[in-house]
């Protein structure tokens, strides 16, 4: 039986992971859970799964959880507090696998800690890899950690790739990687109407159930841009070899086009429990709880090229991965700051790419050869982005 730590257990991916794990109590034991501050949900998860540790970033929330666990007779669960607690539980000796499901840059250090400790890293936090790039991959190679992608697109590519893909996509006969995108809720919205889009409209994804931040990223297609960067790193591919294809039905989750004309596609219902179960069981398979795909109900599949005028964030992501170094970290920090402002109604939806473009022009990228360089670029960009947003409101 394997021990698992779930970073971000109260979020969408964390909840889905626990749903899958509950179906296979003979395969995994939950060693540690973590949350930012959702004490109510974390308490219920602790009561259901009885982890040894529960880590909470906010100290006051940790104190509240500790009191509730004691009152419920669950005082044996050790409650840890602070960002460093996440790194601690991610590298515990009794943990074999780490589900890295914290959204945004906050997940970087604990995910990196899991990689350094040689764990099986089930990577749902794309920002950690986008920010640290080759530095993260070097730690994976050094420690012998196994990196298993959870994003539906990268998990699909992983399933369609030959085992030797780390030698380089071209070296194993891959012509290109085709990442599918739903196009989000505004694929056909008149451009003039995007200026007045509300947070409620932006988070209403047509196919997937996701958190608020990633739903906005899907609406701007920054989510797909981050996935392009992630695909280059995971599969040792060049940016020109990763193509985005708008596929409205979200039935094909991605494809791999080989030099002999073969195209392999991974298909399934849009349910994150499928890639989660694949990574948890790999190299085996087990039941996920998701419905099987009914091809007769699907009936047709449509594909189109993304409109970069409608989705400038996708263009900016390609520019960042082409620039290299800390440019992807700058892109990510600017996007996170802009999305937070949009969700807080302090920035228009169309202001998100403007903030990112401003930051990429103002913050010079450096070599991403140390974690300190990455964190410095992240911090500097957030300041530049926030000032730009504040100036827009004056």
UniProtKB/Swiss-Prot annotation:
One GO-annotated biological process of the protein: isopentenyl diphosphate biosynthetic process, methylerythritol 4-phosphate pathway involved in terpenoid biosynthetic process
Name under which the protein is recorded: 1-deoxy-D-xylulose 5-phosphate reductoisomerase
GO molecular function: 1-deoxy-D-xylulose-5-phosphate reductoisomerase activity; manganese ion binding; NADPH binding
Binding site for NADPH: 10-13, 38, 125, 127, 211
Keywords: Isoprene biosynthesis, Manganese, Metal-binding, NADP, Oxidoreductase
Pfam families in the record: DXP_redisom_C, DXP_reductoisom, DXPR_C
Binding site for 1-deoxy-D-xylulose 5-phosphate: 126, 152-153, 182, 205, 218, 223-224, 227
UniProt cross-references to HAMAP family, sorted A to Z: DXP_reductoisom
Record pathway: Isoprenoid biosynthesis; isopentenyl diphosphate biosynthesis via DXP pathway; isopentenyl diphosphate from 1-deoxy-D-xylulose 5-phosphate: step 1/6
Top-level taxonomic group: Bacteria
Cofactor(s) this protein cannot do without: Mg(2+); Mn(2+)
Protein's UniProt keywords contain Oxidoreductase: yes
Enzyme nomenclature, EC number: 1.1.1.267
Keyword Metal-binding (UniProt): yes
Residues annotated as binding Mn(2+): 151, 153, 227
Function: Catalyzes the NADPH-dependent rearrangement and reduction of 1-deoxy-D-xylulose-5-phosphate (DXP) to 2-C-methyl-D-erythritol 4-phosphate (MEP).
Similarity field: Belongs to the DXR family.
Catalyzed reaction equations: 2-C-methyl-D-erythritol 4-phosphate + NADP(+) = 1-deoxy-D-xylulose 5-phosphate + NADPH + H(+)
